[in-house]
Regions:
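Amphipathic alpha-helices of TPR/Sel1-like and other helical repeat/solenoid scaffolds
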Residues: 153-163, 192
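Generic helix N-cap/helix-start motif at coil->alpha-helix transitions
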Residues: 2-10, 34-44, 69-78, 90-92, ...
Length: 201
């Protein structure tokens, strides 16, 4: 069941909160045994290594998650692109953003990232606390559960992500979208309205 991935994910971020980065990476390892959880393992391995200051290892782990065609999610692009930018690899960031645009030609969301690159201003680190890391885990689970099972479970995990990280536009959109599909329009609109005006969303 869900414990197969929830226990390693949340256990890892609890250990990050306690300052035990090596223990956190070890806690993720059960995810690497199951092919279905490999992308989740690589993503959170990258996030934890990035927080620990191991940028090169983090980039390697992120890059594993985008090897397959069609694997380029918006969140992955944000996370890896941001790290490329903050480590002086602007050309790789630009190539990644352009790849996303070629795969999603109607999306306007890479415009601000490309403009920021031109200005040379580095983005803020997207995950700076264990709580924000756990929010990434909840968001990922919500997204995954929504595609495979019920909206209710997706809504619960999405709400948990927002409890841990209230200003999380992709999670706000996901939860609002679920509410809208359930015809809870007022709550959906409130959530859409709460998205930071400075966000490209």
């Amino acid at each position: 069941g869900m414990n197969t991935f929830m226990v390693p994910l949340l256990g890892a971020w609890i250990l990050v909160g306690l300052g035990d980065m090596d223990g956190a990476l070890e806690a993720l390892k059960p995810l690497n045994v199951n092919k279905g959880f490999k992308a989740m393992f690589d993503l959170h391995t990258a996030l934890i290594n990035e927080m620990a200051g191991h940028s090169a290892i983090a980039i390697e782990a992120y890059e594993k998650t985008i090897e397959k065609p069609g694997s380029l999610s918006l969140r992955l692009v944000e996370l890896l692109g941001s790290l490329y930018e903050r480590t002086g690899r602007a050309d790789e960031a630009k190539a990644l953003y352009r790849r996303y645009m070629s795969e999603h030609p109607t999306s306007p969301l890479m415009g601000p990232a490309l403009a920021r690159l031109e200005e040379g201003s580095a983005p803020r680190h997207p995950v700076t606390t264990a709580g924000e890391g756990a929010a990434e885990a909840m968001f990922g689970v919500s997204n995954s559960v929504r595609q495979r099972t019920t909206q209710d479970a997706a809504l619960i995990f999405g709400r948990m992500a927002l409890t841990l990280k209230p200003n999380f536009p992709l999670a706000q959109i996901l939860v609002a979208d679920i509410l809208e599909a359930d015809n809870r329009l007022e709550k959906a609109n409130d959530l859409y309205g709460s998205i930071d005006l400075g966000s490209p969303f």
